[in-house]
């Protein structure tokens, strides 16, 4: 794995399930696990264009070291970093349990 600068802290968020007796549905997002050190890189417009997606929002990649917490993160979870909330749109393992990479789209500023 290339040298990565883990220079910011992120918090994973998970929706709490609400059961009203008739159905279960996701509720508010609350912190899940502890804060982790991560590396962040922005996805360039050229990369979006070559992938065939023209999306008018900010897309970023967050890379964290592999851990049981990072391995348990799902597409339905979110990431909070630097006062912004990002929806996870893709998850990739880097190396053999070296790191996990989360492709995200900005949800709230």
Show the residue positions of the predicted features.
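Short, conserved turn/kink motifs that form compact alpha/beta structural patches or helix kinks used as
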Residues: 4, 25-109
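Active-site-proximal polar cores
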Residues: 1-26
């Amino acid at each position: 794995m290339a040298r990565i600068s883990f220079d910011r802290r992120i918090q994973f968020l998970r929706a709490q399930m609400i059961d009203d007796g008739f159905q279960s549905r996701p509720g508010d997002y609350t912190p899940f696990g502890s804060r982790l050190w991560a590396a962040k890189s922005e996805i360039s417009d050229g990369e979006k264009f070559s992938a065939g997606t023209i999306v008018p929002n900010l897309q970023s990649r967050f890379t964290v070291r592999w851990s049981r917490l990072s391995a348990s993160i799902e597409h339905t979870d979110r990431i909070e970093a630097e006062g912004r909330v990002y929806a996870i749109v893709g998850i990739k393992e880097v190396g053999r349990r070296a790191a996990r990479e989360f492709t995200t789209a900005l949800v709230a500023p």
